[in-house]
Amino acid sequence: MTQYRHQNSRRRFLQRSILLSAGCSLPPLLAAQNRQVERIGLQLYTLREELSQDFDGTLARVAALGFQEMEFAGYYDRSAAEIKKALDDNGLSSPAAHIQMTAVRSDLQREIDFAAEIGQRYIVVPSIAASERSTDDYKRHAETLNRAGEKTQAAGIKMAYHNHSFEFERAGNRAHYDTLLEETAPELVDFELDLFWIAHAGVDPMPYLDGHPGRFSMLHVKDRDQFGRMTSVGSGTINFAEIFSQADTAGFKHFFIEHDNPGDGFASIARSIYTVRNVQF
């Protein structure tokens, strides 16, 4: 039964993606239900150049567009108190930040203290070095995440891992991503599913969302066009309504819009937040 449900989910996902890539609108029954994302977030890597030039002004413009939650990927030489004040001044919060695995290994307590002062609830490892991607490496990474999760738990913070496409490479019959999911403790480690990168790997997210309920507290809401390029949300082929509809099963709590290299960052996030606001599921 589980295999049949996963095959069915994959078939629906591919059918709807094909419709979207062909420029067709989805039938109302497929496209919309009656829920919407309540609090829309932004992964600030999208605006890294703007933040480096005008940190406070950039946050103000982001807030004016209607974003409410910020996920950091660097703090631009500011203290936790300065970050917290800038967020408060603009009516923003920051549930999460990307922290490199090297910092998790070497200076985790500092990262915990920094995150706690800002009010963050997740420390997210954004990637794994290319030199550390063997089967045994992934098992060690899972152990590292578990140990870190034990330490962060005491501060009310949870560890998480963010995917690219390389984690879906397989060793035998098992994807490396499966190793991370299956060898980390659900009470200690969550996952942030990047919708562009899982699509870029040619992998249907539905079996993961169905098969690992409650593990995916965060999403990177990103789009991919028919040529495989990253694009602003709403300009590509990913069926967000179908993915968002798995919120209760998957455990989605935070929806962070992102574009790695948007060109015009503010134009991109304006288009993207408009799209996400209008996704019904």
What are these regions (language model features)?
Residues 48-52, 71-82, 100-108, 130-136, ...:
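Acidic-and-aromatic substrate-binding clefts and catalytic sites of carbohydrate-active enzymes
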Residues 34-35, 59-64, 78-94, 107-120, ...:
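Acidic (Asp/Glu)-rich catalytic clusters
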Residues 2-24:
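N-terminal secretory signal peptides and thylakoid transit peptides that target proteins
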Residues 69, 76, 101-190:
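Active-site acidic/histidine proton-transfer and metal-coordination neighborhood
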Residues 70, 154-237, 244:
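Acidic/histidine-rich catalytic cores of soluble enzymes
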Residues 42, 62, 70, 87, ...:
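Conserved, mostly hydrophobic/aromatic
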Residues 42-46, 72-74, 96-101, 125-128, ...:
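A cross-domain feature marking catalytic cores of carbohydrate-active enzymes
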Residues 28-53, 60-61:
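C-terminal segment of N-terminal export signals and the immediately downstream linker at the start
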